[in-house]
Structures are given as C-alpha cells and as structure tokens.
Amino acid sequence: MSIISYIAFLLLIDSNLGIPIFVPSGRNISWQPVIQPFDYQCPIHGNLPNTMGLSATKLTIKSPSVFSTDKVSGWICHAAEWKTTCDYRWYGPQYITHSIHPISPTIDECRRIIQRIASGTDEDLGFPPQSCGWASVTTVSNTNYRVVPHSVHLEPYGGHWIDHEFNGGECREKVCEMKGNHSIWITEETVQHECAKHIEEVEGIMYGNVPRGDVMYANNFIIDRHHRVYRFGGSCQMKFCNKDGIKFARGDWVEKTAGTLTTIHDNVPKCVDGTLVSGHRPGLDLIDTVFNLENVVEYTLCEGTKRKINKQEKLTSVDLSYLAPRIGGFGSVFRVRNGTLERGSTTYIRIEVEGPIVDSLNGTDPRTNASRVFWDDWELDGNIYQGFNGVYKGKDGKIHIPLNMIESGIIDDELQHAFQTDIIPHPHYDDDEIREDDIFFDNTGENGNPVDAVVEWVSGWGTSLKFFGMTLVALILIFLLIRCCVACTYLMKRSKRPATESHEMRSLV
C-alpha cells in the first residue's frame, strides 16, 4: 500500500466518524492588526485530541499487528501394519498377499520418526518378506510410521488451530487427533507463542478524567508513540488469543493489563458474538512516515500563506486556514475585518463536525462535559460574514469550514473568493531587504516569445554545425600530415640502403 493510498484510507475512516476541527474556546479575544513583517511560527500537524486539562497516565499497551497469512507448521503422523500373508495349502501352490491395516499411532513413536527424518536417517520397512510353511497360512507384519509436513491455520479469536482434517475442525493442543483415528497432527508451537509473534508492545499515554469505574471512561483515550489514538467511547470487552482485552470502536484491540486498563475493562460492556478485530495497517515505519509527511506539507502551505501576507497579495479562506493550529491548547487566531488582517490569542478545543458546511459550531467542552456553541462572532465582509481562520458564514446562512487539502475538504466558489488583507508596516521594516526579484531562477519552461525561441533554436544549430565543420577539417589535415610524415620516413630509409651486385655482373669481370 502506497503512502498516498494510506492517507486516503485514513481520511475515509475520519469522514465516517466526523471531521475534527479546532475552535477557539474563549469568547473575549483581544484583536490586534498584524504588523509587517509577519513573523509567525507555523503550527505543526497534530490531528490528535486535545489533552488540555486532562490527567495523563503512562502505560504499556499490547495490541495486535496485521496477522500474516503464514501457516503454523507441523506434521501428520500415520501408523499402519503392513502384512505379508503366505497361504500354502497341502493340495496346491503358494499364494502370497499384501495388506495394510491402519492403527492408532503413539506420540512417542511419531516424535522419534520426526527426529529421524530431521537427522536424515529415515527408515522404510515396507512389507516384510513372506514366511511360508507347508499346509499352513502364515502372516508376518511390520508396524510402519509415515510422517508428512502439514501446516494449519491459527484462529486468534478462539485461540486455537483450525484445519478441515481435525476432529471438529479445531484443536488447541500440540498433539491433535485427526479424522479416522489413525493419524495425529504434531507441532512444537503453541497458540500463545504464535499469537506473541503478532502482538506488539508499545508505550503510550492515557488521557482523560480520573477513571472512577463509571461511564466517565468514555471520554478517555490513549495516544501511543506512533501517534495512534485509541478512544474508549463505544468500546467493549472481548478475548483475543485467549487474553482479555478491550476492543475499540475503530477495530483496535489492546490487552487488559494491571492498573487503569483493568478498571476500565471491568466497566465496559461485552462485545457481541462475531466481533472482529483489526490489526495495524500498515507497519509502524510507514505510520511515522505519513505523520511526518503531513507535517511537511502543512508547514509548506502555511509558509506559502505567510509569503502572500508579507507581499500583501490577496488571500482566500483556504489560505487563512493554513495558519490555524492543528492541535488543541493555546495558540493564535486570525480574522479579516474591513480589509485588515487581525490576530489574537485564544485556547483551542477540538470538536467534530458532520461536514464542511454546518448550521452552528456546537461541541462538548471536555472540561465541563457540557455542550455549547463555541463561536458566534461574525463580522460582515461584503456578502459573507468572516469568522476565524477562514471560517465564515455564507449567503445561505450556513457556516463554511475551509478544510485544507490534507483534510480533503470540498472547495466551493466562496472559499476560492480572494479578498485583500492589508497589514500595517513596521516603521523600522525595510521592504527592500527581502526582494524575490534579486533571486535568480533558471528557465524552467515558462512561456516566452515564440519568435525569439525559434531564432535562438536556429542560431544554436548554426553554431553547432560550424563547430562540427571546423573539427572535421582539422581532423582531415591532421590525417594528411601523418600520411606525409610516414611517406617521407619510408623514402629516407630506402635512399640509404646499399646497392647489391648481381651474379651476371660478377661473371663479366
């Protein structure tokens, strides 16, 4: 599974459970105009519940990862008597017959045969030789054991092995009877050992009210070090791999351990029969990678909004949403009023909304467990009412929440409407200190004059052809010069060679 598909999978789950947003909890905010330069520390991505005012308890949780399709190895051991019968009547010839009769195997003998196979000293007795006596019927037998590798499946909910050849289809022991009563299945593994291969132990912190053993546990949640959140709301108790534990609404299961989890476990209802548990998908490394990737993307989007503000470019509601904190607690809040960007300080609380367009921003205050409206301060700006961090009330009277691309929001026409957001220049701020015009960017495919582009292309080819021609002429001249040198050297050697007299000239003397 790729990272992008995993992000989409997480967003799909979140959309089914509600969209989390962070809203200011305070009603009286002191607004001040934003001063240039806009120096703002972009918030990191959190997407985690608000932990403000809640008690924290460190604990170690044991939770199943993805159960692989690997089977549990073992052996089928079969025992039988191999008989040879000799029928030698006084009145006729000998008749030899062979037969195999299954018997119940013994565990010790099966283990001995398995060890012999592992050591490479297997024995095959086969049928014994016949033993014939006149006027008699004689039978000789060998007890033969056969073992073959055979893997079965682990069923973690019931904590047993399953195979269609088992009596009843399931077994919990290291030695299991098979159909026919003449074969047994033997393994060195145990259910606990196989389950332990898929159970991971991770540190976490449980937040919430003091666990008093009543319905207040529903507001508690656990955040582990891999940023996974386990909410106790809608949880139930069930066994998994023969261990008591708590199954959460999103499918996660954690083993009941001593302390706080035991108190909560005893007060949650039991799960209905057939309840399934989901393992962690994907692995821990990819979970951390996705979390860090979201951090980088949202930080980049926030920095883009800061650049627009300092250059006094027009902003959209989506741009302002990138400045909003991604985690509860103390932080900055922004709004546009009369064309001026203003900033204040507040405490954020996480609530969940059904979608990007809602009637009101209602939610439950975790500090009081009371439901209330968190924001009702709207400033008229043209045809819409500006709220906070890009949240506004549109022409339809409904509240529009600009969910950014990380939260997979729906961008409508009003969200894309750009508006001027002036900021007040600081008297000691020199705008010339930051000039993007001074930064050189190489040509990266931007549009230009097509005539100039063609002329540059043709002139470039002309220069290349001229260089190629000059290189070719130089190579030809060098070749001719080498040939001349070789010819001159040959002629000089020939002129120095002494003349020889023939036998005819010597005979005339």
UniProtKB/Swiss-Prot annotation:
Attaches the virus to host receptors, inducing clathrin-dependent endocytosis of the virion. Residues 19-461 are virion surface. The gene is G. The chain crosses the membrane at residues 462-482. Residues 1-18 form the signal peptide. Glycans are attached at residues 28, 181, 338, 362, 369. The lineage of its organism: Viruses, Riboviria, Orthornavirae, Negarnaviricota, Haploviricotina. InterPro entries: Rhabdo_glycop_CD (IPR055447), Rhabdo_glycop_FD (IPR001903). A motif (basolateral targeting ex vivo) lies at residues 496-505. Keywords: Clathrin-mediated endocytosis of virus by host, Disulfide bond, Fusion of virus membrane with host endosomal membrane, Fusion of virus membrane with host membrane, Glycoprotein, Host membrane, Host-virus interaction, Lipoprotein, Membrane, Palmitate, Signal, Transmembrane, Transmembrane helix, Viral attachment to host cell, Viral envelope protein, Viral penetration into host cytoplasm, Virion, Virus endocytosis by host, Virus entry into host cell. Belongs to the vesiculovirus glycoprotein family. Homotrimer. One of its GO terms (cellular component) is viral envelope. Glycosylated by host. It comes from Spring viremia of carp virus. It is found in: Virion membrane; Host membrane. The keyword Transmembrane applies. This is Glycoprotein. One of its GO terms (biological process) is virion attachment to host cell. A lipid is attached at residue 488 (S-palmitoyl cysteine). Residues 483-509 are intravirion.
